[in-house]
């Protein structure tokens, strides 16, 4: 056989370019993280082939697909070679370099590209079962028993910064807000990239879990079930709810400093739009104060005007939570806070 087909974990363990040959639409919905999309067929071509398959059968659909393939073979090769050349490879144990290719189900699309690359002695491998089997692997990963430690605390207690430092010091962390490109509040999308699809959000979490030693502690920030439009996988979220929880406490002054540092860099118009989205919950007086304070760059008043609202929301979400340990980090620097946090967990 001119190419090798690998099971998902074996496929993922090899080093080399990771090529997704599905259509751009399929790729946008969800893909293996760090993969490059070099589609065998664009969205329209895939639709045409699919229609022929339904109306006239597999044979005619394959013939039509081969026509598209023949016309763009040179362009495909150029794109493939460009991706391969730009990839900084790390040899595997056998010093072999593989081009990893996958399509929807491990069928003709990935096989066709593998055949093409094999002609140039480029050692392609394909994913057995394709992206469909990968998604099954992703969803299965959330049912594993995990040693999660949830970092909780009111808005402005520096939870995200603590999580970032934990990762810097090589502790196992999952930045759910980073993966979701959203901070989880009405201001959460400010300065962030477009949110990924929920499918892609799940893929990122699963890949991170795969890199961990499951028996060791995994730190995550306390979140609602939804982060913007991204929904935390149900089984993973249930484990978060039943895990150990460290509740960070800081003074109001500390919290205001943190919020001012985070949000004062954004455009006034963006901040005002965010305030208006929760005006019914803030009430007319606090909304007016917040909007005027943004206009006058009184960031302390802006943050104070919304802090009470978020504190009430947080207390409501915390109802029924057990296994909570309080950690007062008022006036402590973040490096010092990390040591205290780790000493209280590990």
Name what the model sees in each region.
Residues 118-135, 175-180:
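A short glycine-rich beta-strand->turn/loop micro-motif centered on a GG-aromatic cluster
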Residues 239-245, 249-346:
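Conserved NTP phosphate-binding and transfer environment spanning the P-loop NTPase/kinase superfamily
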Residues 168-238:
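Conserved nucleotide-sensing/catalytic segment adjacent to the nucleotide-binding pocket
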Residues 18-22, 35-38, 174-175, 219:
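Short hydrophobic beta-strand that contains or immediately precedes a catalytic carboxylate
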Residues 1-33, 61, 139-143, 148-154:
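Flexible, polar/low-complexity N-terminal or interdomain linker segments that lie immediately upstream
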Residues 66-127:
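Catalytic cysteine-centered active loop of the rhodanese-like fold, especially the PTP/DSP P-loop
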Residues 108-109, 147-168:
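Glycine-rich phosphate-binding P-loop
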Residues 28-78:
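Glycine/alanine-rich phosphate-binding loops at beta-alpha junctions
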């Amino acid at each position: 056989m001119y190419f090798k087909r690998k099971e998902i974990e074996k496929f993922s363990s090899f080093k080399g370019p990771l090529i997704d040959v599905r259509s751009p639409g399929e790729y946008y919905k969800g893909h293996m993280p760090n993969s490059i999309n070099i589609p065998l067929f664009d969205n329209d071509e895939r639709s045409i082939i699919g229609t022929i398959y339904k109306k006239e059968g597999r044979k005619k659909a394959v013939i039509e697909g081969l026509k598209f393939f023949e016309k763009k073979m040179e362009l495909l090769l150029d794109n493939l070679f460009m991706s391969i050349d730009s990839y900084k490879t790390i040899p595997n144990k056998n010093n072999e370099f593989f081009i990893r290719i996958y399509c929807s189900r491990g069928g003709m699309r990935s096989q066709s590209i593998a055949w093409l690359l094999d002609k140039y002695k480029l050692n392609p491998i394909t994913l057995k079962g394709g992206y469909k089997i990968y998604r099954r692997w992703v969803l299965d990963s959330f049912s594993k028993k995990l040693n999660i430690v949830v970092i909780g605390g009111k808005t402005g207690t520096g939870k995200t910064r603590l999580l970032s430092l934990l990762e810097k010091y090589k502790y196992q962390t999952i930045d759910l807000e980073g993966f979701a490109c959203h901070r989880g509040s009405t201001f959460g999308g400010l300065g962030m990239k477009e949110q990924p699809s929920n499918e892609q959000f799940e893929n990122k979490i699963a890949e991170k879990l795969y890199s961990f030693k499951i028996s060791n502690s995994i730190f995550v920030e306390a979140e609602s079930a939804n982060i913007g439009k991204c929904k935390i996988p149900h089984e993973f979220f249930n484990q978060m709810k039943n895990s150990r929880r460290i509740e960070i406490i800081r003074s109001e002054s500390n919290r205001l400093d943190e919020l001012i540092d985070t949000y004062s860099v954004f455009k006034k118009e963006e901040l005002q739009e965010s305030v208006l989205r929760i005006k019914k919950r803030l009430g007319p007086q606090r909304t007016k104060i917040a909007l005027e304070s943004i206009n006058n760059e009184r960031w302390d008043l802006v943050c104070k005007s919304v802090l009470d609202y978020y504190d009430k929301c947080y207390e409501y979400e915390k109802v029924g939570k057990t296994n909570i340990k309080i950690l007062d980090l008022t006036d402590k620097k973040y490096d010092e806070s990390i040591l205290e946090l780790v000493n209280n967990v590990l």
